[in-house]
Amino acid sequence: MSNTVSLQFPDGSVREYDASMTGAALAESISKSLAKKAVAYAVDGTVRDLSDPLGASGKVEIITREDPRALELIRHDTAHVLAEAVQELFPGTQVTIGPVIENGFYYDFARNEPFTLDDLPVIEKKMREIIQRNKPFTKEVWSREKAKQVFSDKGESYKVELVDAIPAGQDLKIYYQGDWFDLCRGPHMASTGQIGNSFKLMKVAGAYWRGDANNPMLTRIYGTAFANDNDLQAYLHMLEEAEKRDHRRLGREMDLFHFQEEGPGVVFWHAKGWKMFQNLVSYMRRRLDSHGYQEVNAPQVLDKSLWETSGHWGWYRDNMFKVTVAGDDTDDDRVFALKPMNCPGHVQIFKHGLKSYRDLPIKLAEFGNVHRYEPSGALHGLMRVRGFTQDDAHIFCTEEQMAAECLRINDLILSVYKDFGFEEITIKLSTRPEKRVGSDELWDRAESVMMTVLEQIRQQSNNIKTGILPGEGAFYGPKFEYTLKDAIGREWQCGTTQVDFNLPERFGAFYIGADSEKKQPVMIHRAICGSMERFLGILIENFAGHMPLWFAPVQVVVATITSDADEYAKEAAAKLKAAGLQVVTDLRNEKINYKVREHSLQKVPVILVCGKREAEEKTVNMRRLGSRDQESMTLDEAIARLCEEATPPDLLRLKNAG
């Protein structure tokens, strides 16, 4: 075995090194300044401790604090410091798990008396002390027996359970920070001092051990950490903005929807909210129609045999709502399920009747109501529900048509997002996972096509960021994931394009090829909004409730100053409605400022104020949401202007093109 390794650096240069050299020594050999800034290193994309030996040849990178990958290390290390601080302050507390999550980290603790928000400042202060000590992170590999004995002696029963769960043959890594240690896969930075002080503990919550309600309840402490104070403050400011924009609060203020205990995870839509929902459906329906989709509707309840054939019963049964039927003899003992996905139903529609290669591509779309079980603790307004509407479509095509169809889908998705003001989009290709169906040759072809498509997308637009997610594809094929950035910088994964070799084969779907032989179609799953409910939640928060005029459930309120203007206000409202606008009149005997405040709280885009003078002159005083300005104009002028603004963007393009 060779004692030297060949390392390729980011600039393309290749050098030989002793295999036993550590990452820290490698950084030192390049430059002392780099060694000071280094927090970890990576070989062939795998991040390692600086204390790890090189071991093997590959592409090497020194990771500094400025590298995006360092953020996960900072948060991981901060979680360990949190655990140490808790055990210093509250002896007898057991530590369990503490992973990095999106935008931060958490750690779960077992303690007789749960932590409260009042404990967080004290814990945070102790964490800063530990960081100031600048203790090195060091790693040891223990035997299973030693690990169980040590943690058992410490009274750490949860850690003993974690040790038992680690597969035989896998190293049991123990990381020390000074004298304190924890079971951990790593990697870590060189010392606690490299964490810095740009962190904050955010909240406490209850969490069942291993997410099982039959297990003990633990206390979870959430925190966040960043590479510098500017990033931390920007994040905290974003959270403040997000709280102001919370769609649940705005939903109440705007009278859009509500939830209640008798229907956990399902939406009670009020009239205004349902109007907004229908606006979204109508817009999407027009877009699909113009792109050659056929809208269909498949049953919501189907026999489990269909779900067994599709594979959902085996892969997804625990997340499905099951129904047993106590009917006549033919129905006894049958088990049905509410559909969690639309795809199996669409395959049945495709199979109904013989299809020729000349018929392809066939594009089936549905605004399908689906139901998926989510733990009650995971439910979150419109963003995480149990019953929702999916803007699903499935394109049945030949393998040769796959690239062109993926590009057409991409054009449609980006166009829809642009119409709602989302132009910062990231598209990532998720490639084959370890567990998958289909031959490697089939995956090679599909990934090659989608890689080419991704490159074409990247070249077409400067606003589009692209990337690869190795091993993150569905078991049945590779997929694109579309993530959009909202007005306050948050990212939301919405659209998907997934290639499926599996479902057509499972159901025996085929078309007749040019050679008169049966061929299996490629099936492309496509969603733009994803969950329509969730997309509406995103829109409400993105616009802070101030929806574009064309999308608002109530577009105009005609409000009177005095009763002298009541008849004129009714006449004005009738003309506005006749022009196609969504109008409400407010003739109440209230002061006009009170009316304006109330309708502004409900985020009505335009208020037309009518008094005695306006009634005499056939004018209106226009006030827009968020503006102090008032503009006087004739009623006809107001109607013309508002009708233009209230035209949906897709129809406006058609109008301008004509």
Swiss-Prot record:
Pfam families xrefs: HGTP_anticodon (PF03129), TGS (PF02824), tRNA-synt_2b (PF00587), tRNA_SAD (PF07973)
E.C. no: 6.1.1.3
Domain spans labelled TGS: 1-64
Main location, first listed in the record: cytoplasm
SUPFAM superfamilies recorded: Class II aaRS ABD-related, Class II aaRS and biotin synthetases, TGS-like, ThrRS/AlaRS common domain
GO cellular component, one term: cytosol
GO annotation, biological process: threonyl-tRNA aminoacylation
GO molecular function: ATP binding; metal ion binding; threonine-tRNA ligase activity; tRNA binding
Keyword Ligase: yes
Residue ranges crossing the lipid bilayer per the database entry: none
Catalytic activity as recorded in UniProt: tRNA(Thr) + L-threonine + ATP = L-threonyl-tRNA(Thr) + AMP + diphosphate + H(+)
Locations listed in the record: Cytoplasm
Top enzyme class: ligase
Details of cofactor binding: Binds 1 zinc ion per subunit.
Entry keyword set: Aminoacyl-tRNA synthetase, ATP-binding, Cytoplasm, Ligase, Metal-binding, Nucleotide-binding, Protein biosynthesis, RNA-binding, tRNA-binding, Zinc
Subunit structure: Homodimer.
HAMAP family given in the database record: Thr_tRNA_synth (MF_00184)
Name of this protein: Threonine--tRNA ligase
Origin species: Brucella canis (strain ATCC 23365 / NCTC 10854 / RM-666)
